[in-house]
A protein has these predicted regions:
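ATP-dependent adenylation/nucleotidyltransferase module used to activate substrates
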Residues: 4-143
């Protein structure tokens, strides 16, 4: 039996094409766990949206590591802004580091394998916070 998987790239391209008839640029809040993971997504989305990167990751082990990754994210964005990838400057929002949020949702799941229930709860936590921030700040889209 052939399993039909979602082609999210094609769905994204179709959405972008459907927006092209609009006479405005849409604002998109992009959650980022780190600069390397967001690099290709930013390249793909920047020509079509006014991007703001949302750096929020309470699952990071220490404040030092959280700050280091946030600084790398800022550095990547500054490079992209210098290269004028978009007609709009890419912005960043760095949420305060609060690992307690992660500890609360992962309590009792310490022995779960990578990619298991603990990870699913962490994804939900971060995307829910991204959605809340997008709504609060009036973004058209979030991802």
């Amino acid at each position: 039996m052939i399993e039909h998987k979602q082609n999210y790239d094609r769905q994204m391209q179709e959405l972008i094409a459907s927006l092209s008839s609009e006479k405005r640029t849409f604002n998109l809040l992009l959650h980022s766990c780190c600069a390397p993971c967001s690099s290709s997504v930013i390249l793909k989305l920047a020509p079509f949206f006014k991007l703001t990167v949302f750096y929020y990751n309470p699952n990071i082990d220490t404040d030092e590591e959280y700050t280091k990754r946030a600084e790398e994210q800022k550095h990547l964005i500054s490079i992209y802004n210098e290269e004028n990838l978009s007609s709009h400057k890419i912005e960043i929002i760095k949420e305060a580091y609060d690992p307690q949020e992660f500890y609360e949702i992962s309590q009792g799941l310490e022995d779960c394998p990578e990619g298991g229930e603990r990870c699913m709860r962490c994804y939900l936590l971060r995307l829910k916070k991204t959605a809340e921030r997008a709504k609060k700040d009036g973004f058209d889209f979030f991802t």
